[in-house]
Amino acid sequence: MIFDGFIKNLIYDPVSTLGILIFYFLLINLPISLLALFNKKSSSFVRFFTILINLFIALQLIFRWILSGHFPISNLYESLYFLVWGISLGQLLVEKEYPNPIIPVIAIPIELLTIAFACFVLPDDLKLSSNLVPALRSSWLIMHVSVVMLSYAALIIGSLLSASVLFINNRQPLQLRSSSTGIGGFRMSNEYSGNNFNEPINFTHTEELDTLSYRSILVGFVLLTLGLITGAIWANEAWGTWWSWDPKETWAFISWLFYAAYLHMRISRGWQGRRPALFATSGFFVVLICYLGVNFLGIGLHSYGWIFGILN
């Protein structure tokens, strides 16, 4: 009966049904990822569910594309799922480079909260697909928005990896060992003598985590740069101006400056130890404000107007 009901819902409303299913997969994957900290065998289940989640999000977005007739990243609901798709893909790529159970532990809660927000918090009118306004009926929609969302995913992963470095090395003095190209990272001046309970996490390998954080942020920065360039070209094509200091544009530029400062610090080695890690970690909130905070104020060309809609 339950399976029959699921099939009916999947046929009637595949987008919402798959969205709920993705939420439950993440809900299952979270405790398994925590268990993997102490049991390496659980890591294979975490990767399996992460791959499944990534594929189901892709399938959901494909259904949305078919039903709406346009690329499924034109509203907040769609972009939230696209963001989680990007984060989960980045999680898998990072784990392939450095298979450490701490990586899904920091990524999955963000993915779960994002999907929960999309499923249960967003008003129904923001979940519905609608016809695009003339300015959005452009190939730049795919080129600009998808690149920006992938940049957010990469920057979030990089910031969370920096947070994990700080968490793992709590109360441990850190020293920056990276070269000007960012190869290397933090190392503890006094090696950590681990114990059997925490054995699956190699606490002396935070250098690799920091290196992956740097590389993720570098990828995100490059994508954000491309996003700003394509956005300016699209704006000129749609509205006749390259830059209008729209709140979203302004915060995207602030985010770009923020991470440019971080990369400058890493390349020049002007800062050492915890300070660049703290700087990168705080970047998570910069991205959060740029992506959600500005939009919800209901101001500018990029806004969704949710908060103002409630207040009115």
Curated annotation (Swiss-Prot):
Membrane topology, as annotated: Multi-pass membrane protein
A molecular function (GO) term: heme binding
Described function: Required during biogenesis of c-type cytochromes (cytochrome c6 and cytochrome f) at the step of heme attachment.
CC terms in the record's Gene Ontology section: plasma membrane-derived thylakoid membrane
InterPro entries found in the cross-reference section: Cyt_c_assembly, Cyt_c_biogenesis_CcsA, Cyt_c_biogenesis_CcsA/CcmC
Superkingdom assignment: Bacteria
Keyword Nuclease carried by entry: no
Cell location: Cellular thylakoid membrane
Primary site of residence: membrane
Name of protein: Cytochrome c biogenesis protein CcsA
Subunit annotation: May interact with ccs1.
The family this protein is said to belong to: Belongs to the CcmF/CycK/Ccl1/NrfE/CcsA family.
Taxonomic placement: Bacteria, Bacillati, Cyanobacteriota, Cyanophyceae, Synechococcales
UniProt entry keywords in alphabetical sequence: Cytochrome c-type biogenesis, Membrane, Thylakoid, Transmembrane, Transmembrane helix
Pfam families reported in the protein's UniProt record: Cytochrom_C_asm
UniProt GO BP: cytochrome complex assembly
Transmembrane segments: 18-38, 48-68, 73-93, 102-122, 148-168, 216-236, 250-267, 279-299
